[in-house]
A protein has these predicted regions:
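N-terminal cap/lid segment of alpha/beta-hydrolase-fold proteins
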Residues: 1-28, 395-397
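Glycine/threonine-rich phosphate-binding loop and adjacent beta-strand/alpha-helix elements that clamp
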Residues: 5-10, 293-525
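Short substrate-entry loop that stabilizes the transition state in hydrolases
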Residues: 28-32, 37-60, 65-67, 72-74, ...
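Accessory cap/linker subdomain of secreted extracellular hydrolases
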Residues: 51, 59, 123-124, 128-229
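Alpha/beta-hydrolase active-site loop
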Residues: 81-99
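Alpha/beta-hydrolase fold nucleophile elbow
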Residues: 101-113
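Short glycine-enriched nucleophile-adjacent loop
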Residues: 114-126
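Short beta-strand/loop motif that positions the catalytic acidic residue
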Residues: 230, 236-238
């Protein structure tokens, strides 16, 4: 790899803006197929937090182009987020294909922001020959900033401040850069984040999304890939603990509806920590479509990592049981009292009162939204008296659960707004004090009528898990999940953010008569 060489080149766009790219070349004279990544974090980094270095891809026979998007890194212009990317992507693709070392074949890769830059372009733009978007989505609401109406507090503020720090560095605002950095390291950003974004990046995406999340008439944007692009060979990569997973599933469905044949891979990954083998899998896909000798793809359509058996499986949309929640009213004060009853059992009319104290909110652990994303043991959380817990009897035979856990529940509340934070877990057979959290979900209820009962639906993060004979299934419900989401103050005139004197103690009544836990299909189409 020592003989791999690189150079920087400029692309001047139609409006005169210059975009800077770093181009890594294999040994020899080419021409070669091109792998393109367009990203906002600096071409020197090249997403090496999750991807192999560009020199590795070049050593496999690819010309690798890492481009700084408009207004970032070494590129000119003003950074305006996703709105700029359709036009800039189209012009970049045309330029890349004109490079003398390019043999005319183009593949794209990258995750998160870099994932979306692969999917949006001007009408009429020829598509890449193959595309590997990872951990991304099209809806700026549901796939980029909010879940169940609640803003991704830790993630959204943290990412927004990263971009704000880059802006400060670009402007040589060293004081601002240090203030942002110190707030991130001290965790003060969880309390000061809104003000810092307003101060240092008021036109940024994160600040805009944060304000939209509390607006009564939000105008959210959803990006639309060209159907011709969705018909091309497409490998979509998701992680069970990644916040953009629902976005990846949405793109998969849209590609199917467009007439494409997308491949889907969901592994044991957070946004920044992937599994061994992810690089080789992507290389195999590129080789299958960009190198003549491997033209036939051997990929199955949907490959999923089983969270409990720790292995890869094909998707099987099998019918799963449903459960209802039962309690004699003590499911929060006694973590062994609440019961998950099979759907064949008769439902019981009962109520559990859950008190949310904003002074001591339930911390978010593990999952896809917290600051400790991944697998987690929530035993210590479930024994708290402000968490309502419902546990099944031991499973009688192996049970495979694939899909989107969805909880249907009626509630009322003594405040005008509140949150429901729900976790689904497995309690392994004969393992003491272990409650392995598999999935979480949230629903933010705003402007409700105090004391009026209403039906709620909480959709959790998708899963694939096999419960062995003797294992038990658990649902845990609380009124907070800090700092994955901001604290709901119980008053609509105040924002949901860090704990403050404006936050009220809130009593949430869970009415169990019509409660139901079911698993909806991973793919709806």
């Amino acid at each position: 790899m020592n003989s791999i060489r690189y150079r920087d080149e400029d692309l001047q766009l139609r409006d005169g803006t210059v975009l800077k790219s770093r181009i890594w070349s294999p040994q020899g004279n080419g021409p070669w197929p091109v792998l393109l990544m367009r990203q906002p974090y600096g071409r020197e980094i090249a997403s090496t937090i999750t991807y192999a270095h560009p020199s590795w891809w070049a050593s496999k026979g690819y010309l690798v182009v890492i481009q700084d998007v408009r207004g970032q890194g070494g590129s000119g212009g003003e950074f305006s987020g996703f709105n700029q990317e359709a036009s800039d992507t189209s012009q970049t693709h045309n330029w890349v294909r004109s490079l003398p070392e390019c043999n005319g074949l183009l593949g794209t890769y990258g995750f998160s922001y870099q994932g979306l830059t692969q999917l949006i372009a001007e009408e009429g733009t020829p598509p890449p020959d193959c595309i590997i978007p990872a951990m991304t989505g099209l809806s700026e609401d549901e796939h980029w900033s909010c879940e169940g109406g609640a803003f991704w507090w830790h993630l959204g503020i943290g990412w927004g401040l990263q971009l704000a720090a880059q802006k400060a560095q670009r402007e040589k605002n060293w004081k601002g850069w240090h203030e942002i950095r110190e707030n991130l390291e001290s965790k003060k950003y969880l309390y000061n984040g809104h003000d810092l974004l307003e101060k240092y990046d008021p036109e940024g995406m994160a600040y805009k999304w944060l304000n939209l999340s509390s607006s009564k008439t939000p105008q959210w944007k959803t990006h639309k890939p060209l159907s011709s692009w969705l018909k091309k060979p497409l490998l979509l990569i998701g992680g069970w603990w990644d916040p953009h997973l629902k976005g990846i599933l949405d793109i998969f469905e849209k590609a199917k509806k467009a007439g494409g044949n997308p491949k889907l891979l969901i592994g044991p990954a957070t946004h920044l920590q992937w599994w061994e083998g992810a690089q080789r899998t992507q290389l195999d896909f590129f080789d299958s479509h960009l190198k003549e000798k491997n033209k036939e793809s051997h990929f199955s359509q949907i490959n999923l990592w089983n969270l409990t058996t720790k292995g890869w499986e094909l998707s099987v949309q099998n019918k799963t049981p449903t459960w209802s929640l039962r309690s004699e009213g003590l499911a929060s004060i006694n973590h062994l009292e609440g019961f998950l009853a099979p759907n064949s059992d008769l439902e019981a009319d009962s109520e559990v009162n859950l008190v949310h104290d904003p002074w001591r909110p339930i911390p978010s652990i593990g999952g896809h939204l917290s600051d400790t994303a991944g697998e987690a043991n929530r035993y210590q959380l479930d024994i708290r008296p402000d968490v309502a817990v419902f546990t099944s009897d031991p499973i009688l035979k192996d049970l495979r659960l694939e899909g989107i856990p969805t909880l249907f529940l009626e509630t009322n509340c003594d405040r005008e707004c509140f949150d429901l934070f729900v976790a689904l877990s497995i309690i392994p057979k004969a393992v003491e004090n272990t409650v392995t959290q598999l999935s979480t979900g949230v629903l933010r209820i705003a402007n409700c009528d105090k004391g009026i009962t209403s039906a709620r639906e909480i959709r959790l993060q998708p899963i694939l898990a096999t419960f062995k004979k003797g294992d038990r299934l658990r649902i845990s419900i609380s009124g907070s999940g800090w700092p994955a989401i901001g604290i709901n103050p119980g008053q609509s005139k105040y924002l949901c953010e860090g704990p403050s004197p404006n936050c009220l103690v809130t009593t949430i009544s869970l009415l169990l008569l019509n409660s139901k836990l079911k698993f909806e299909s991973l793919i709806s189409s």
